[in-house]
From Swiss-Prot:
Protein name per Swiss-Prot or TrEMBL: Glycylpeptide N-tetradecanoyltransferase
Positions bound to tetradecanoyl-CoA: L177, C178, I179, N185, K186, R187, L188, A189
Gene designation: NMT1
PANTHER family according to UniProt: GLYCYLPEPTIDE N-TETRADECANOYLTRANSFERASE (PTHR11377:SF5), N-MYRISTOYL TRANSFERASE (PTHR11377)
Membrane-spanning intervals of the chain: none
UniProt family annotation: Belongs to the NMT family.
Note: Has an ordered Bi-Bi kinetic mechanism, with myristoyl-CoA binding taking place prior to peptide binding and CoA release occurring before acylated peptide release. Cooperative interactions between the acyl-CoA and peptide binding sites of NMT contribute to its extraordinary chain-length specificity.
Assigned GO CC terms: cytosol
Activation/inhibition comment: Competitively inhibited by SC-58272, a peptidomimetic derived from the N-terminal sequence of a natural substrate.
Lineage: Eukaryota, Fungi, Dikarya, Ascomycota, Saccharomycotina
Catalytic residue list: L451
EC numbers for this chain: 2.3.1.97
This protein's UniProt keywords: Acyltransferase, Cytoplasm, Transferase
Organism, scientific name: Candida albicans (strain SC5314 / ATCC MYA-2876) (Yeast)
Length: 451
């Protein structure tokens, strides 16, 4: 899970170990030059099938020599004597509670220890159990003597397509790499990465998608985090937003106030009956991007409507727009992952929404930008009833078309997209490569949205 370093926090955390650098990588956080050099020079990454930072890609394709699952060892990698591998059963609420505690105490946290992700059982079920999921891809490490869970890494199946070369590749998304704070000197991170790679390779999958800060060879592109305040007053109370010069709290609240009801005629929640139609709309729309995710209808239903088809999801929200003839012309989705707020007398939780996938049939029409702004404005409005205080997105997809008019602001965090064991040509990330500022009204190359 990659997240922006919220607020205007310092990016100069001390460099101590490879595990801490990987932790910062998971935060999508900019590192100091010394940290970047340490990561770049670390021997582990030189052994991995990733492009070097200095090479120019002349041809797309796998980096490693062709292998088969029979070439992959059957046994897990050895761990130091005090620890043992543990495959987590996320259908077991007790083990989910263990994972929650590990992540809550040790996962992504801003440097000032102000915010932590507040995961729910439902979120874990949604994020870790899409169609095609495998139990042995939920990899834990426990202390032998006590059974305590002290590390975790996960993989979930993802099929992606490179539109320019028309190549379709089975892969996984790597997520939730987490190591207990007291074990950062045990060099568990490289072992976890190698072990999840081994398990994925045994299923004849040789590529992986992942995201992180600008410290690894070699990103497809860099995107920048964007934030749209929904409840500015609360964001100010917890230190997420600051009062600009020559502004009052009242003026800031008024600036970000949204209507109570959506504006688009024909907007309604997406249902299971819409899956096939919306997926077709998305595929046509996403032809404009360089890299996209392909879904079966079963996968798309899971990601858009949630893990339990018999109840409304508390994690992901999807809406469609129907015209007067009942034809679906647009759709949007976002997922909810709140923060726990630490050491604040007024608030203990911050509602966070993350823009997910969207599509419109107006992408070739003159009114496309206007339509996209209307669509995302309604996404912001609908999020209010779910307790959202800030709505986040990246500069991927066509997001730069609506950021200014919808009053998003650039955050401090940057997120790189990476492909493991595959070379591709560089892609546009919606920002200027030198200044890192948003390039308005420019289609990015990234049509994949990872958790």
């Amino acid at each position: 899970m990659s997240g922006d370093n919220t607020g205007n926090k310092s990016n100069s955390a001390p460099s101590k170990s490879i595990e801490e650098l990987l932790k910062l990588l998971a935060m999508g956080q900019e590192l100091s030059p010394a940290q970047q050099k340490e990561m770049k020079d670390y021997k582990f990454w030189k052994t991995q099938p990733v492009p070097s930072l200095s090479e120019t890609v002349t041809e797309e394709g796998p980096i490693d020599k062709l292998k088969t699952p029979e070439d992959v060892p059957n046994d897990p990698l050895p761990l130091i004597s005090d620890f043992e591998w543990s495959t987590l059963d996320i259908d077991d609420n007790l083990q989910l509670d263990e994972l929650y505690k590990l992540l809550y105490d040790n996962y992504v946290e801003d440097i000032d220890a102000t915010f932590r992700f507040k995961y729910s059982h439902e979120f874990f079920q949604w994020a870790l159990k899409p169609p095609g999921w495998r139990k042995d891809w939920h990899v834990g490490v426990r202390v032998k003597s006590t059974g305590k869970l002290v590390a975790f890494i996960a993989a979930t199946p993802v099929t992606f397509k490179l539109n320019k070369s028309n190549k379709v590749i089975d892969s996984v998304e790597i997520n939730f790499l987490c190591i207990h704070k007291k074990l950062r000197n045990k060099r568990l991170a490289p072992v976890l990465i190698k072990e999840i790679t081994r398990r994925v390779n045994k299923q004849n999958i040789w590529q992986a998608l992942y995201t992180g800060g600008s410290i690894l060879p070699t990103p497809l592109t860099t995107c920048r985090y964007q934030h749209r305040p929904i409840n500015w007053s609360k964001l100010h109370d917890v230190g997420f937003s600051h009062l600009p010069p020559n502004q009052t709290k009242s003026s800031m609240v008024a600036s970000y106030t949204l209507p109570n009801n959506p504006k688009l005629k024909g907007l309604r929640p997406m249902t299971g009956k819409d899956v096939s139609t919306v997926l077709s709309l998305l595929y046509k729309y996403q032809e404009r991007f360089d890299i996209v995710q392909l879904f079966t209808e079963e996968e798309f239903k899971h990601w858009m409507l949630g893990h339990d088809e018999n109840s409304d999801s508390n994690v992901v929200k999807s809406y469609v727009v129907e015209d007067e003839n009942g034809v679906i012309t647009d759709y949007f989705s976002y997922y909810l992952l709140p923060f726990t707020v630490l050491d604040n007398a007024q608030h203990d939780e911050l509602g966070i929404a993350y823009l997910f996938y969207y599509a419109s049939d107006s992408f070739e029409k003159p009114n496309y930008k206007k339509r996209l702004n209307e669509l995302i404005t309604d996404a912001l409005i609908t999020s209010k009833k779910f307790g959202v205080d800030v709505f986040n997105c990246l500069t991927c997809q066509d997001n730069t078309y609506f950021l200014k008019d919808c009053k998003f602001g650039s955050g401090d965090g940057f997120l790189n997209y990476y492909l493991f064991n595959y070379r591709t040509f560089p892609m546009d990330g919606g920002i200027d490569k030198k200044t890192k500022e948003v390039v308005e009204d420019q289609t990015s190359g990234i049509g994949v949205v990872l958790l």
